[in-house]
């Protein structure tokens, strides 16, 4: 399981390197969506089933809509991929070399020293448990958001609506 998480972490970082090397919006959106799926899989492996599902549905659903729209607005006849230009290819290869160097350095020293200590965050940690008296906190948190934080949900929805309206007005050009 450790090697699976290690491989997922490396692929998550490589997805960020692939996006930050500034390819065409088509490929950049694809890399962000794949990186989001990998991040949700990491959350699922740590025991956060509900949180991983919600991030997958909300974040990736929004990302697909946004990148579908930006791809339609910025369509190119010959989109720039990672191997089409020397600058893009060099930046991807430099990022890959840095990631491989970091992985080899971590494997050489047999681990990483923890700099940040999480002592008093017991209720925020993702955990897995199967028992009659155990209540998982991630689904209850969503219920509390809609019960006690109903105005936060309304403000968030209104903010998203205004953001979409502003993007449409900017893209329209009037």
Swiss-Prot record:
It is a multi-pass membrane protein. GO terms for biological process: mitochondrial electron transport, NADH to ubiquinone; mitochondrial respiratory chain complex I assembly. This is NADH-ubiquinone oxidoreductase chain 6. It catalyses: a ubiquinone + NADH + 5 H(+)(in) = a ubiquinol + NAD(+) + 4 H(+)(out). GO terms for cellular component: mitochondrial inner membrane; respiratory chain complex I. Its EC number is 7.1.1.2. GO terms for molecular function: NADH dehydrogenase (ubiquinone) activity. Core subunit of respiratory chain NADH dehydrogenase (Complex I) which is composed of 45 different subunits. Belongs to the complex I subunit 6 family. It holds the Pfam family Oxidored_q3. The gene is MT-ND6. The keyword Electron transport applies. It comes from the Eukaryota. The lineage of its organism: Eukaryota, Metazoa, Chordata, Craniata, Vertebrata. InterPro entries: ComplexI_Subunit6 (IPR050269), NADH_UbQ/plastoQ_OxRdtase_su6 (IPR001457). It is found in: Mitochondrion inner membrane. The chain crosses the membrane at residues 1-21, 24-44, 47-67, 86-106, 111-131, 151-171. Keywords: Electron transport, Membrane, Mitochondrion, Mitochondrion inner membrane, NAD, Respiratory chain, Translocase, Transmembrane, Transmembrane helix, Transport, Ubiquinone. The keyword Membrane applies. Core subunit of the mitochondrial membrane respiratory chain NADH dehydrogenase (Complex I) which catalyzes electron transfer from NADH through the respiratory chain, using ubiquinone as an electron acceptor. Essential for the catalytic activity and assembly of complex I.
